[in-house]
Amino acid sequence: MRLLLVADVHDAAKTAERIPGNFDAVIAAGDFTYRRSLEAAVEVLEALARIAPVYFVPGNTDPPELASYENAAVKPVHGRVLPLGPYAVGGAGGSLPTPFNDLFRVAEEELERLLQRLTPTPQILVVHNPPRGVLDKVGGVRPVGSAAVRKYIEERQPAMSVHGHIHEDRGLDMLGGTIVVNPGPLKEGFYAEALLDGTKITVRLRRV
């Protein structure tokens, strides 16, 4: 299975049209629009769905009601788990409060509650907010990740965990046996590819 991993699209849906290759699904880790409306976020999701079916969580710049938007090709996994071929994908959207005018804020307790609802444990986790201490450095210095997300990954060990939010901390890391991915902001042309073959996962960072 070949997955396209994206985050922090911020209205740059046309960038996705330039991504080469075919994918079985798109895993999208939030922040689809700066325009502060459900219609704007849906417009971006529909553009991504022209590549492959989209499994997503909203980000802090997206309206909270996006978490329940769904159609045949666009599937929210905020607080729930859905099948994806032989795998399962689930997650949580929003972010811990920032100094900016967020639309979708969640406290640590809410993130923990959402993650504990994920049954069964998904092999593919998608959470806008990164785990504390992993791909979460603002300006390369200050960690702003979630302790609840880190705890969940450490305890449940999904095969892969996809995050966004911190544009400048794009990369790959490991948390126990979990591959942690920040594909980077699609707004700047960054994305990642994941190849899944049974329990083997290979992730490559790309740029359009």
What are these regions (language model features)?
Residues G21, P120, R156:
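Active-site charged/polar residues at nucleotide-handling catalytic sites that mediate phosphoryl
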Residues H10-T15, T33-E39, P58-A67, P97-P99, ...:
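Active-site environment of divalent metal-dependent phosphoester hydrolases
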Residues R35-E39, L84-V89, E154, G189-L196:
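Short, charged, surface-exposed secondary-structure boundary motifs
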Residues D11-A12, Y34, D62-A148, R207:
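Conserved catalytic scaffold of divalent metal-dependent phosphoesterases
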Residues V6-L84:
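Core catalytic region of metal-dependent phosphoesterases/phosphodiesterases
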Residues M1-L4, L82-G91, P120, I124, ...:
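Beta-strand-turn-beta hairpins that frame and shape the catalytic cleft
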Residues E46, Y55, V138-G198:
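Conserved beta-sheet core of the metallophosphoesterase superfamily
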Residues L5-A7, V26-D31, V54-N60, P76-H78, ...:
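Active-site neighborhood of phospho(di)ester-bond hydrolases with catalytic His/Asp-centered motifs
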